Amino acid sequence: MTKEEFRNAVVEGIKRVKGLDAVAIADDETFTHAGLDSLDSMNLVLEVEGITGLNFGEFNLSDANTIDEFYGKAGELLARGA
């Protein structure tokens, strides 16, 4: 999965969680910049799992609070074949 594909999945997830038509967030901006709180972040992980087919398990977005960091975690999962 390319970073652009993952980024698109995250943006789509944010739109679904927040009920928005569009989201503007840079790869290095925190998810709070897009208006997500801790509950929204948990829901975002679930949305991204559904879109990408990845299983993040008990992953907490506070450990990766930007698209760049979240993609790094996804890369670890892909490397392990998750």
Regions found by a protein language model. Name each.
Residues T2-A34, D40-V45, G50-A82:
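Phosphopantetheine-dependent thiolation modules in NRPS/PKS and related acyl-activating systems
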